[in-house]
């Protein structure tokens, strides 16, 4: 979760920060909740009451005032929402979203096309969470991709998915705080193995989630991550990118390797890392840098964060390494998801999702 060109003055300052204050506070909430083993809403209350100073807030939580009146003011842990999202049959709330054409349905059925969605679903934003979760899940049900890569999943969101998406197998990078997830359509994608690679110096609970699968006789290695956030953590983010690329290089030559996730990358950071290896491509660049799906974090178009500065960045990216015997799987198209506001007046996430279709050469 989570500027580029921004407007002058305050807008330029917003880009230098790389992420608004509200986002930093959500990360503090996650850290607090992890330490205190409490709900994120409880963490937010204690941090806000203590001027967002972690140590003061934790002391307040673990050593509350003994007066009865003070105890009564302590917020109760908020239980998991009782309404669950049905991934399998819910109508999309985006009336303008074009549906999959019959030819694409046929291509999926006969195995000549492979589809994926990657989306930072902004689970740390608790406002309108149930409505936004329904919005995200309606897109997943509409497009029914073979693989779904999600970032910023939180336990209640995971429960939505786990309880109502029986047609998908879900692998997560963690089970507490916030984490990534990979969802595999059981009818097409056969899981062979999975692994989690820790980022040893992360300050934000980040890691690399990998699964090895088989699709229509093709061996694939699928990866997702949520790289370190904010401008101030660029060095750590670049180290994490290097780990991702190294892992992609180490995958068996017989496998097609796909990484999809929220990289938080600025183009200059990729350049500073030496660029991508010769055998790994950025799918957006491979497809000719289409303008319609360039920016996945766009505060001019997306009002969820309430930022006045017009900031556009391509945080969410897909990296692709073909198998040694090239030509079996080829990226074909890329589109944005989640561009319409929901009935609650907000978008499903502060990020747009990415829908990628790939051709399988039979």
From Swiss-Prot:
Q: Which cofactor does it need?
A: Mg(2+); Mn(2+)
The family database entries (Gene3D superfamilies) matched by this protein are listed as: DNA helicase RuvA subunit, C-terminal domain, Endonuclease/exonuclease/phosphatase
Task: Determine if Acetylation is one of this entry's keywords.
Answer: yes
Keywords for the protein's UniProt record, in alphabetical order: Acetylation, Cytoplasm, DNA damage, DNA repair, Host-virus interaction, Hydrolase, Intellectual disability, Isopeptide bond, Magnesium, Metal-binding, Neurodegeneration, Nuclease, Nucleus, Phosphoprotein, Spinocerebellar ataxia, Ubl conjugation
Its subcellular locations are: Nucleus; Nucleus, PML body; Nucleus, Nucleolus; Cytoplasm
Binding residues for Mg(2+), per the UniProt record? 122, 152
Q: Name one GO molecular function term.
A: transcription corepressor activity
Q: Mutating residue 351 to Q: effect?
A: Loss of phosphodiesterase activity
Cross-link type Glycyl lysine isopeptide (Lys-Gly) (interchain with G-Cter in SUMO2), residue numbers: 23, 82
Q: Give the GO cellular component terms, alphabetically.
A: aggresome; cytoplasm; nuclear body; nucleolus; nucleoplasm; nucleus; PML body
Q: What is the effect of changing residue 262 to H/L/M?
A: Loss of phosphodiesterase activity
Q: Which residues form the active site?
A: 262 (proton donor/acceptor)
Disease the record associates with this protein: Spinocerebellar ataxia, autosomal recessive, 23: A form of spinocerebellar ataxia, a clinically and genetically heterogeneous group of cerebellar disorders due to degeneration of the cerebellum with variable involvement of the brainstem and spinal cord. SCAR23 patients manifest epilepsy, intellectual disability, and gait ataxia.
Task: Give the quaternary structure.
Answer: Interacts with TRAF2, TRAF3, TRAF5, TRAF6, TNFRSF8/CD30, TNFRSF5/CD40, TNFRSF1B/TNF-R75, ETS1, ETS2, FLI1, SMAD3 and ACVR1B/ALK4. (Microbial infection) Interacts with Hantaan hantavirus nucleoprotein.
Protein's name in the database = Tyrosyl-DNA phosphodiesterase 2
């Amino acid at each position: 979760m989570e500027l580029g060109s921004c407007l002058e003055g305050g807008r330029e300052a917003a880009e230098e920060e790389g992420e608004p204050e509200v986002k930093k506070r959500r990360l503090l909430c996650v850290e607090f909740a992890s330490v205190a083993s409490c709900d994120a809403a409880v963490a937010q209350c204690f941090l806000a009451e203590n001027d967002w100073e972690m140590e003061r807030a934790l002391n307040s939580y673990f050593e509350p005032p003994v007066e009865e009146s003070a105890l009564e003011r302590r917020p109760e842990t908020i239980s998991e929402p009782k309404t669950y999202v049905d991934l399998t049959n819910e109508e999309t709330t985006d009336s303008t979203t074009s549906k999959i054409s019959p030819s694409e349905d046929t291509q999926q059925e006969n195995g000549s096309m492979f589809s994926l969605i990657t989306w930072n679903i902004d689970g740390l934003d608790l406002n309108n969470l149930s409505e936004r979760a329904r919005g995200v899940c309606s897109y997943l049900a509409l497009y029914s991709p073979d693989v779904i890569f999600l970032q910023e999943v939180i336990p209640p969101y995971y429960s939505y998915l786990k309880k109502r998406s029986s047609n998908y197998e879900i692998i997560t990078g963690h089970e507490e705080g916030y984490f990534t997830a990979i969802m595999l359509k059981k009818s097409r994608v056969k899981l062979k193995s999975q692994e989690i690679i820790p980022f040893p110096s992360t300050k934000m609970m980040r890691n690399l989630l990998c699964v090895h699968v088989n699709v229509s006789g093709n061996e694939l290695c699928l990866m997702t991550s949520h790289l370190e956030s904010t401008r101030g953590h660029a060095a750590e983010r670049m180290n994490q990118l290097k780990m991702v690329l190294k892992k992609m290089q180490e995958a068996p030559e017989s496998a097609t390797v796909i990484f999809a996730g929220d990289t938080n990358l600025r183009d200059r950071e990729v350049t500073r890392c030496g660029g991508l290896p010769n055998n790994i491509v950025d799918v957006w660049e491979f497809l000719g840098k289409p303008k319609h799906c360039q920016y996945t974090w766009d505060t001019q178009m997306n009002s969820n964060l309430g930022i006045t500065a017009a900031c556009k960045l391509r945080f969410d990216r897909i990296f692709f390494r073909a198998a040694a015997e090239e030509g079996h799987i080829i990226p074909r198209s890329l589109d944005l998801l989640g561009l319409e506001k929901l009935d609650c007046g907000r978008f499903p996430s502060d990020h747009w999702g990415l829908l990628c279709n790939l051709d399988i050469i039979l």
